[in-house]
Amino acid sequence: VNIVFSSRVPRECRSELEDLLFFNPRQHRVRDGIIDSLAHFGHPRVEETSSGLSVRVGDHEAQTLFAFDRDKKTKAPVGVVVFLRTSAEEIAIPHVAVDDEYALQGSEAGVGLGVTLVEKVKEIASRIVGVKRIVFFYRQEVVIRL
């Protein structure tokens, strides 16, 4: 598996991105966290920008990191994490989605893609002056200290 990361998705991958975000077959496992996140931040939506597709959450300006498998023929993402700065000291992760093949019991599970995406946000957060913690909403507001 050859995973790379980007903040944009090609426009032609809209339906695959929507499937990943909104119709993920494993989302029932974190249903309560999703409901909490939606109540707190609003609904995610796919938006077209001049450089491709991104994800917006409610009225918030969110950052999005997409994972792509270079070994796949498709340009569609295999994972996504949405995060935003909620205060001077905090970044929240309201949404994470991983293609079923890359989930814990999937055929490509060895990459630990969900954990890798959260770790990437942790790397980014550690470079932002003042940020001291990341709050992950899918697991009863897990707090990751930096």
Predicted segments, located by residue:
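Glycine-rich acyl-CoA binding loop
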Residues: 106-122
